């Protein structure tokens, strides 16, 4: 969950998000070191009174500023490619959910069950109860079991949408007529909030996403109740 005036990422709730945060810190440190070096060189050049008018070229300097950036780019690219493949890998999901974007709500269908599906609308401000978050709460949450591979099939009924939950490190475009997929494993129980992340019309800001992760036995109880109500 995000906090007021927060500058960093939300707490990671999935292994992929933990990897993304580590990669961000790794890249940020490289950028910080390069910026410090450049600032030092500029300061030294501006403050010194020494000049050397006899150096017209330097083979050694050209070798260094060619090889060093290449090494730095490799140090960034290798972990980046690793995470890219991790995010795209979907092996033996325990549960598949189809998320459909509409103007302006989400509908969910649990494809492993025959009649388990529902629409998820934002709760209006006047209907909120104490402790609920404005513009983030929905009347039906997407409930999933924790510590289980979950596959989400994402599409849209009308215009472009995007299904995104920052704490899980997930963002997938919802394109009409096209079925995209993403996957995640939630590490701990909790309620995780997201929003449509593709401008989709007048009420784009009012189609939140709420994912609730519960132990497997609680999920089975919830799914049984939902099937009875269907």
Swiss-Prot record:
Name of the gene: MT-CO2
EC number(s) on file: 7.1.1.9
Necessary cofactors: Cu cation
Class of this enzyme: translocase
Known partners and oligomeric status: Component of the cytochrome c oxidase (complex IV, CIV), a multisubunit enzyme composed of 14 subunits. The complex is composed of a catalytic core of 3 subunits MT-CO1, MT-CO2 and MT-CO3, encoded in the mitochondrial DNA, and 11 supernumerary subunits COX4I, COX5A, COX5B, COX6A, COX6B, COX6C, COX7A, COX7B, COX7C, COX8 and NDUFA4, which are encoded in the nuclear genome.
Major localisation: mitochondrion
Alphabetized GO MF terms: copper ion binding; cytochrome-c oxidase activity
A single BP term in Gene Ontology: ATP synthesis coupled electron transport
Catalytic activity field: 4 Fe(II)-[cytochrome c] + O2 + 8 H(+)(in) = 4 Fe(III)-[cytochrome c] + 2 H2O + 4 H(+)(out)
Gene3D superfamilies assigned to the protein according to its UniProt record, in alphabetical order: 1.10.287.90, Cupredoxins - blue copper proteins
Co-factor remark: Binds a dinuclear copper A center per subunit.
One Pfam family named in its UniProt record: COX2
Residues annotated as transmembrane: 15-45, 60-87
Binding locations of Mg(2+): 198
Binding residues annotated for Cu cation A1, in chain numbering: 161, 196, 200, 207
GO cellular component: mitochondrial inner membrane; respiratory chain complex IV
SUPFAM superfamilies: Cupredoxins, Cytochrome c oxidase subunit II-like, transmembrane region
Protein name: Cytochrome c oxidase subunit 2
PROSITE patterns: COX2, COX2_CUA, COX2_TM
Free-text function comment from the UniProt entry: Component of the cytochrome c oxidase, the last enzyme in the mitochondrial electron transport chain which drives oxidative phosphorylation. The respiratory chain contains 3 multisubunit complexes succinate dehydrogenase (complex II, CII), ubiquinol-cytochrome c oxidoreductase (cytochrome b-c1 complex, complex III, CIII) and cytochrome c oxidase (complex IV, CIV), that cooperate to transfer electrons derived from NADH and succinate to molecular oxygen, creating an electrochemical gradient over the inner membrane that drives transmembrane transport and the ATP synthase.
Subcellular location: Mitochondrion inner membrane
Family: Belongs to the cytochrome c oxidase subunit 2 family.
Membrane topology: Multi-pass membrane protein
Keywords associated with the record: Copper, Electron transport, Magnesium, Membrane, Metal-binding, Mitochondrion, Mitochondrion inner membrane, Respiratory chain, Translocase, Transmembrane, Transmembrane helix, Transport
Organism the protein comes from: Scyliorhinus canicula
């Amino acid at each position: 969950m995000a906090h007021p005036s927060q500058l960093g990422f939300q707490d990671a709730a999935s292994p992929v998000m933990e990897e993304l945060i580590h990669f961000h810190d790794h890249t940020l440190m490289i950028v910080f070191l390069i910026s410090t070096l450049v600032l030092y060189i500029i300061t030294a050049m501006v403050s010194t009174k020494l000049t050397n008018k006899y150096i017209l070229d330097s083979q050694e300097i050209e070798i260094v500023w060619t090889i060093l950036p290449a090494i730095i780019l490799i140090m960034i690219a290798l972990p980046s490619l690793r995470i890219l493949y991790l995010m795209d890998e979907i092996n033996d999901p325990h549960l598949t959910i189809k998320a459909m974007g509409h103007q302006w709500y989400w509908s969910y269908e649990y494809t492993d069950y025959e009649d388990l599906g529902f629409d998820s609308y934002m709760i209006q401000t006047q209907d909120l109860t104490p402790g609920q978050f404005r513009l983030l709460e929905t009347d039906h949450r997407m409930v999933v079991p924790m510590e289980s591979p979950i596959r989400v099939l994402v599409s849209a009924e009308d215009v472009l949408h995007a299904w995104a939950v920052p704490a899980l490190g997930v963002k997938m475009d919802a394109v009409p007529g096209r079925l995209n997929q993403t996957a995640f494993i939630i590490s701990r129980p909790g309620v995780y909030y997201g929003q449509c992340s593709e401008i989709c019309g007048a009420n784009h800001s009012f189609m939140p996403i709420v994912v609730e992760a519960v132990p497997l036995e609680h999920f089975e109880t919830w799914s049984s109740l939902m099937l009875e109500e269907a």
